[in-house]
Amino acid sequence: MLNCYLAFPKYDPIIFSVGRFSAHWYGLMYLIGFYFIMWSSIKRYKLISLNKEKIENILYFSFLNALIGGRIGYVIFYKTKEIFFNPYFIFKVWEGGMSFHGGLLGSIISIYYFSKKYNCKFFKISDFLVPLIPFGLGFGRIGNFINGELWGRVNTSFCFTMLFPGSYDEDVKFLLNNPHLQDVFDKYHLLPRHISQLYEMFLEGILLFIILNIFEKKKKPTGYMSGLFLILYGSFRIIAEFFRQPDPQIGLMFNYISLGQILSIPMILYGLILIINSK
């Protein structure tokens, strides 16, 4: 047992409240991510044959559809039973729970619609946008951390793991099959876990942004950047999932692979197809 585990920082997840309305840090992170995407897109608008107003329209509706799709995807993929017993659960976005894969589908619908409306190829638009998506992903993962959700798997042999108050129930269940960790639990009343939200922030936010923007500097055929994004995100997500605690209602499939990893495999395969067929 180590004595260097990190404590989850104590703070109020609510920034301020006015009557029944409360502004949460979680939601603010998504807005900051969207702001950076919007700001960067306007600065880069000359890279695509669309004016600033059209780019703004695409981004506003893509962001809205990403939120809707992300929430619906989360409920469908991870909380199917919950919606039957508590239909209003889908609207409680401040409690966390967004699916990237659902959000991606929502954004694709918006981009497809505007590609037809503005007579601009779908992959021209998506290639223009994907180098900026890591802004949203990175800040979204910070939001997950602030919300104290999506924590990692138990690890007592690594100093920079963290004690998450929200993991208490899962820690108790984990002890049933791992009684040798009882002394750790007795001392901290929690089990140390990987800070998987910050791992994902680095992989899906910082590293993905750097790689995509390096490749974008060299002229690529249409569809190439979109394919590269799908391959890289899918690969980084698969890596991160090995450190992230599987959703308790789903667990690991075949005792090894998570749902997030399964959903990422088609992304990688389609990304390869896009790159091979890019023109």
Swiss-Prot record:
Family the entry assigns: Belongs to the Lgt family.
Localisation: Cell membrane
HAMAP family xrefs: Lgt
Free-text function comment from the UniProt entry: Catalyzes the transfer of the diacylglyceryl group from phosphatidylglycerol to the sulfhydryl group of the N-terminal cysteine of a prolipoprotein, the first step in the formation of mature lipoproteins.
BP term (GO), one: lipoprotein biosynthetic process
E.C. numbers: 2.5.1.145
Membrane topology, record value: Multi-pass membrane protein
The organism of origin for this protein: Wigglesworthia glossinidia brevipalpis
Designated name of the protein: Phosphatidylglycerol--prolipoprotein diacylglyceryl transferase
Pathway(s) of this molecule: Protein modification; lipoprotein biosynthesis (diacylglyceryl transfer)
GO function term, MF aspect, one: phosphatidylglycerol-prolipoprotein diacylglyceryl transferase activity
Main location: membrane
Top class in the EC scheme: transferase
UniProtKB keywords: Cell membrane, Membrane, Transferase, Transmembrane, Transmembrane helix
InterPro entries in UniProt: Lgt (IPR001640)
Keyword Amino-acid biosynthesis recorded: no
Binding site for a 1,2-diacyl-sn-glycero-3-phospho-(1'-sn-glycerol): 141
PANTHER family: PHOSPHATIDYLGLYCEROL--PROLIPOPROTEIN DIACYLGLYCERYL TRANSFERASE (PTHR30589:SF0), PROLIPOPROTEIN DIACYLGLYCERYL TRANSFERASE (PTHR30589)
GO cellular component, one term: plasma membrane
Membrane-spanning intervals of the chain: 22-42, 58-78, 89-109, 128-148, 195-215, 223-243, 256-276
